[in-house]
Amino acid sequence: MTMEGASGSSFGIDTILSSASSGSPGMMNGDFRPLGEARTADFRSQATPSPCSEIDTVGTAPSSPISVTMEPPEPHLVADATQHHHHLHHSQQPPPPAAAPTQSLQPLPQQQQPLPPQQPPPPPPQQLGSAASAPRTSTSSFLIKDILGDSKPLAACAPYSTSVSSPHHTPKQESNAVHESFRPKLEQEDSKTKLDKREDSQSDIKCHGTKEEGDREITSSRESPPVRAKKPRKARTAFSDHQLNQLERSFERQKYLSVQDRMDLAAALNLTDTQVKTWYQNRRTKWKRQTAVGLELLAEAGNYSALQRMFPSPYFYHPSLLGSMDSTTAAAAAAAMYSSMYRTPPAPHPQLQRPLVPRVLIHGLGPGGQPALNPLSSPIPGTPHPR
């Protein structure tokens, strides 16, 4: 079935199918506009993509190419486009490049394809605004989101509008932006978790260390004796009777021993120097305690002669002076003698050490060398008797 036009072009089915198979993008995609208008619309659709449709795809699924619907063509435009295309086909002109229109209408893969070399550079944002402000011809759709997006100002859509890009490009950028916005938070969380792990490890180390220290202290306290334990007392030396008698005789002669005398006495008694020194210290303590008790008793009784017999003084007191003293003065003298006796004198030279004969006892001796019962009551001849 073939129809002839006024200009000699045929409208046969085989002619239309052959022209469709020859690679006309306008016929294949349902675009029946003239070739010049189709190219202009293609470049316009590439240069000025629908900003609102791209905005609607932010954070949602990529928009389907079906949303870019075409208005129903008018009958006279369809006839003109068919005649023009058939005339070009009979004149054996090379077919127009099908890469650019097909690329503009078909959905691209996820990765962005390179732009054709004949495409002009994308206009600046001012030109985009002016182009978008112009009335739309064939890129408008009747979807609810597109109709609602037409009322949005272009300024809100301009930051999201870029050059020719695939529908999947904007969600990738949005996902990258979201990932970059969450990256500092993730880094902060990672740093916090690392710090928490370090603190936990340090606390575990500290607890483990304190536990080990406690175990060491327990084991050391079990194995070794306590630090504040008293030193073991030395065993008391058991002296024999012979050793005690020799030590008592030596103490009656000398209350303080020199180093040489102590060593000689220790060698004679088969004792150590430390044992002899300890025995002398204990004996002097006992002697001073007994002397203090005796001085108190004699001072209370006022018997100064007995005090002189018990504790001879190196100083000579004339009997007349002793006879004129009362009991209070005698007690004071006894206290002075006691205090002088407790002063530890330096060890005299061994050659000078000899038993001193008490001078008071010599003067207190009676006729025949017998001690007088009351030496203060027997005055020396030629001295007045005190009354």
Curated annotation (Swiss-Prot):
Q: Where is the composition biased (Low complexity)?
A: 100-113, 127-141
Q: Which GO terms describe its cellular component?
A: chromatin; nucleus
Superkingdom of origin organism: Eukaryota
Checking Gene3D superfamilies in the record gives: Homeodomain-like
Task: Write out the biased-composition intervals (Pro residues).
Answer: 114-126
Q: Where is the composition biased (Polar residues)?
A: 7-24, 160-178
Described purpose of this protein according to its UniProt entry: Potential regulator of neural basic helix-loop-helix genes.
User: Hey, which family's this protein in?
Assistant: Belongs to the BAR homeobox family.
Task: Supply the name of the protein.
Answer: BarH-like 2 homeobox protein
